[in-house]
Amino acid sequence: EDINRIVYVIPALDGSLLVGEIYQYGLLDDNIELYSQMMPALMGVDEMAGYLVNIVLRIMPNADLNTILDVVAFDLVNDYMKYSTLLWGLVPSGNYEPCREMYLMDDSMAVIREQTDWFYNAQKNSDANIKEAVSQGVKVFDIVDYNVPLYEIIDSWDDVNADGVIHLDSTSMGAYSVGVAKELPKDYVSTVNNCTNPNHDHSDPRNIVDANTGLLPCTTFYFYNQNHESTGSNDVIMKLVSE
């Protein structure tokens, strides 16, 4: 009763594929992308340093390097990530159950498993809970960044649209897209329309996103080519949030 307005700003309502796939599959396993994409991404903004690392890594056999990365990812999850309920909260619902079987079934993980199971159930019911809040008069808004690829450290980095960190389906509560800078097929027909006002037009002028499939098309704002990290410095977004 005390909440009358909710503003989501690039929310991870269904986690981030970056986290989910690291838990479930480890790091990127494609040799070409490994050298050209992942290492520069891991080195951050210093691309030169990333490519210098690539030169050194190319001396190593591909199989050896992939084995090393698999071990690093496995140890990272087993020694640190599996104990963090915060990070478990960023595992998408589609990744949770197999990851739960992999890391949480030991008796020593019972306390953490209880908490992550609770969050997983809340995650699955997120859309229903938001719709219920709207029906009770709560105004819910969503700010979505899109058309920036996920960091190239997981195998499916190029399979979804994203803001660099969180995939579009999670931030937009279900908006459909084929991928970054990929137009919807000419024969595409939306099977979901969450806008009940026939006078509204939520079509993407670039034909990249079907906003009608998002849970709240009338109160969701999309920012093209906006990456996750610089959202806080976007004056338009900050003004929307504060008003």
Regions from the language model: what does each represent?
Residues 2-243:
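Lipid deacylating catalytic domains
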